[in-house]
Amino acid sequence: MSVLKILHYPDQRLRLIAKPVEKITKEIYKITNNMIDTMYQEEGIGLAATQVNIQLQIIVIHKIHAIEKNLILINPKIIEKKGSISIEEGCLSIPEYRAFVPRFNYIKIQAINLNGNTVEIEADSILSICIQHEIDHLNGKLFIDYLSELKRERILKKLIKLKKRIK
């Protein structure tokens, strides 16, 4: 498998809306395996395909935050939601920045698994937050979109400085 390049804000490709996966193919298996390798390499807890410039509705969640194995969700949709929770979130596409974001504490998801079967998954707490965060990516939304414009401008300036330091 291989590690994919993660897009970083303000890359406009992060704002693209992912297309549904029509059929589970060998290429989809390869994409999900590469996404998992990338997530582990970058020490993330979740990753959306759009973060690695693949415009398909695929998310992966680290096994520690899923149940007992990595969670792969294709074409995920939230079909039920309730309660509220807010913890400090970070993102592989927005390095070195964290913020509190309001989320639903409980969600029920409908998605397709790698066998092509429709599944429903209930999640709460950190798993719920992680799934919502990754689904946002599929819709071209970043966690900083929940913040004020002033905070977003500060983040952008900080990331530009960070990028200059790295070069």
Curated annotation (Swiss-Prot):
<dbReference type="InterPro" id="IPR023635">
    <property type="entry name" value="Peptide_deformylase"/>
</dbReference>
<dbReference type="Pfam" id="PF01327">
    <property type="entry name" value="Pep_deformylase"/>
</dbReference>
<keyword id="KW-0408">Iron</keyword>
<keyword id="KW-0479">Metal-binding</keyword>
<keyword id="KW-0378">Hydrolase</keyword>
<comment type="function">
    <text>Removes the formyl group from the N-terminal Met of newly synthesized proteins. Requires at least a dipeptide for an efficient rate of reaction. N-terminal L-methionine is a prerequisite for activity but the enzyme has broad specificity at other positions.</text>
</comment>
<dbReference type="GO" id="GO:0043686">
    <property type="term" value="P:co-translational protein modification"/>
</dbReference>
<dbReference type="InterPro" id="IPR036821">
    <property type="entry name" value="Peptide_deformylase_sf"/>
</dbReference>
<protein>
    <recommendedName>
        <fullName>Peptide deformylase</fullName>
        <ecNumber>3.5.1.88</ecNumber>
    </recommendedName>
</protein>
<feature type="active site">
    <location>
        <position position="134"/>
    </location>
</feature>
<feature type="binding site">
    <location>
        <position position="133"/>
    </location>
    <ligand>
        <name>Fe cation</name>
    </ligand>
</feature>
<feature type="binding site">
    <location>
        <position position="91"/>
    </location>
    <ligand>
        <name>Fe cation</name>
    </ligand>
</feature>
<dbReference type="GO" id="GO:0042586">
    <property type="term" value="F:peptide deformylase activity"/>
</dbReference>
<keyword id="KW-0648">Protein biosynthesis</keyword>
<dbReference type="GO" id="GO:0006412">
    <property type="term" value="P:translation"/>
</dbReference>
<comment type="similarity">
    <text>Belongs to the polypeptide deformylase family.</text>
</comment>
<dbReference type="GO" id="GO:0046872">
    <property type="term" value="F:metal ion binding"/>
</dbReference>
<feature type="binding site">
    <location>
        <position position="137"/>
    </location>
    <ligand>
        <name>Fe cation</name>
    </ligand>
</feature>
